[in-house]
Amino acid sequence: MDNTQAIAPPSYSRRQLLNFLAGTTVAVTASAGAYAMGKFFVPPAEKGGAGGGIIAKDVLGNPIPASQILAEAPGTRALVAGLAGDPTYLIVKEDGSLDSIGIVDSCTHLGCTFPWNGNDQEFQCPCHGSRYHPDGSVARGPAPLPLKIVQVAVVDDQIFISPWTDLDPRTGEKPWWV
């Protein structure tokens, strides 16, 4: 005699089916919420030039046309939002064009922001007194390193800022921030 029974496929009760559907609904809703929160906290990719460059922006995040900066007097240092939103000085040269080197406004001593002093023709950090020459090299410490620089290019009245990849023109060596 054979005492084996055929195994019947499991049948879901109404309660199990409703629990499964409710759990699936909660999981889908939570996933959609997590995706939306992730998109909120991750900044959108910047669209810009080649080499990881971005368009220079004002404090409100609006692109700044090159003509606006170039309307300033020669020697002017205009502060814009550059790479990663870092404040960056753009320099109007004596011939009325924009310098291809921008200077990031972050002291190499402790990261303070600093103004350009037109009377003394140098950047002066108010936190601990570091001073920098117009090209961003250290004039007086305690800052140990020259200021970070970026590449600046003008294309169709748009200012593109991209990371500095060449040798530092002030030292002739590989930049310390690369």
From Swiss-Prot:
Keywords: 2Fe-2S, Disulfide bond, Electron transport, Iron, Iron-sulfur, Membrane, Metal-binding, Thylakoid, Translocase, Transmembrane, Transmembrane helix, Transport
Keyword Membrane: yes
PROSITE patterns: RIESKE, TAT
One GO CC annotation: plasma membrane
Cofactor: [2Fe-2S] cluster
Disulfide bonds: 112-127
One GO MF term: monooxygenase activity
Residue ranges annotated for the Rieske domain, each copy included: 61-161
Main location: membrane
Membrane-related topology note: Single-pass membrane protein
Pfam families: Rieske (PF00355), TM_PetC (PF25471)
Enzyme superclass (EC): translocase
Record: residues binding [2Fe-2S] cluster: 107, 109, 125, 128
Catalysed reactions, semicolon-separated: 2 oxidized [plastocyanin] + a plastoquinol + 2 H(+)(in) = 2 reduced [plastocyanin] + a plastoquinone + 4 H(+)(out)
EC number: 7.1.1.6
GO BP annotations listed: photosynthesis
Family: Belongs to the Rieske iron-sulfur protein family.
Name of protein: Cytochrome b6-f complex iron-sulfur subunit 1
Lineage, top ranks: Bacteria, Bacillati, Cyanobacteriota, Cyanophyceae, Synechococcales
Name of the gene encoding the protein in the UniProt record: petC1
